[in-house]
Amino acid sequence: MIAIDRMTPGSPPAGFSFARTGQGSEGKWTVTEDRTAAAGKVIEQTSTDRTDYRFPLAIHENVPAANVDVEVRFKAVAGKTDQAGGIAVRLLDADNYYVARANALEDNVRFYRVVAGRREQLEGANLRVSPNEWHTLGLRAEGQRFTVSFDGKKLFSATDKTFAGAGGVALWTKSDSVTRFDQFKITVLP
């Protein structure tokens, strides 16, 4: 588990680098106090740039892996264009990775492949994603199989072989989403 509780409020999260897919301004990632979070602190993306094709990334710096099981609690706090939070895996750079994301404005969970900065949906499910409530999003990548879970229940699996090698793991948001992240767990699989 990433030690968010040891991070300094008001500062960028330690052990992360930052990038953006698409257009618009860079994301603004900071550690914020939140009494509803397990650790009392969260990693939050606070930029409200409404550019539609804009995906801020907070990349954990110490996990290059192909096979991983990633889970994070997130809360969509605000956003007029979007209220989304997600997990990116096998991230080669800001324009090449896989992402599972949930969107409280659209009430859905989607799994995408991002190649050369362009998203392509591989799988998805429509379900209630309540804003301003904690939800748990999971993404397991093993070989060519990707399994997405939401609030502890498996939603769907997809297969793809575009990115087979090791890559980074990141937190992800879209457009003007103000999203908080808590209990970020990364398990490298054999």
Model-derived segments and their meaning:
Residues 3-6, 15, 28, 67, ...:
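Extracellular/lumenal ectodomain signal focusing on beta-strand-rich modules
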Residues 4, 70-72, 132-148:
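Short tryptophan-centered beta-strand motifs in secreted/extracellular beta-sheet-rich domains
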Residues 149-153:
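Short strand-turn-strand beta-turns centered on an Asx-Gly dipeptide
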